[in-house]
Amino acid sequence: QIVGAFTFSYNWVALSGGDGYFAATTPELFRNMWSLAVEEQFYLLWPIVLPLFLMLPRSWARVTTALVAATASAMWMGAVVASGGDLTRAYFGTDTHAFGLLLGVALAFGMAPLLRRLAVGDLPAWARSGGARATVSALGVAGLIGILAIASIPAGDTTATFPGALLAASVCAAMVILAGVWPGSRLGRALDAIPLRWLGDRSYGIYLWHWPLLVLLVAATTGTGPEAGVPIGVGALALAFTLALAEASYRWVETPVRRFGFRGCARRLRAALRARAARRATALAGLATGAALVAGAGAAVAAAPA
């Protein structure tokens, strides 16, 4: 698990080890790393694939190509499930679960011409019209409702879920993003509210922390895994710890690394450790938070349920 988590290959490591995402008796501590693995593998491949897209002369051709690729990925997931294949293989596979990312590619290529014109103050009249904004906002609201509806439906083990519900959720998410970035969109302004922005800025840390904390807290209090049920109090405690640790990692790890890079952070940390005691405490807090992401993983595995 640790090797897969820190090399962004968790999905394939788990599959090679026979770990089942849907097994209720073996909740892996770093199970949530599978989606980050798919994402990072896409980031590695995208610089190679992007020039091929850019060879297409028109935006519509790029959008169509991305949509065809997304459809192929979804159909491949459906084929794996329909043939009686392993659900975890269908769910974890980068090839079978790339359709959400590819829909994002299509949306980016589709919006690029409009956003370029917006940047130079040359937005076309139709895009600024009240009708366009109302239509896009309605699509965004429909997307939000769709996501909530899909989340409330119990997952099955057929193609209705793999890829049906998953693909539908990705389409709904694309609709929300479209409404969120559309110039003058009311939904975009609503989604930019301070509490939602706070959550969005820390969403990476929230995702990283939530599952290991939940597994450990449930195991410590009930002796079972989260799939067997999470008591309300334990869930609330896991949420509180998740938000606190996400804020700490955002403030003392993510933001400095984005701003100064790894080497810059190391230099600043050494300088801060030589400074007065007040600054030293802040630096140590950052060091402790970073160490928790690495050294704490090994100790956490020992406490995880079998």
Give, region by region, the residue ranges found by the protein language model.
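Membrane-interface helix/loop caps of multi-pass membrane proteins
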Residues: 1-265
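Membrane-interfacial segments at transmembrane helix termini in multi-pass membrane proteins
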Residues: 256-282
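Internal/C-terminal transmembrane anchor helices
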Residues: 274-305
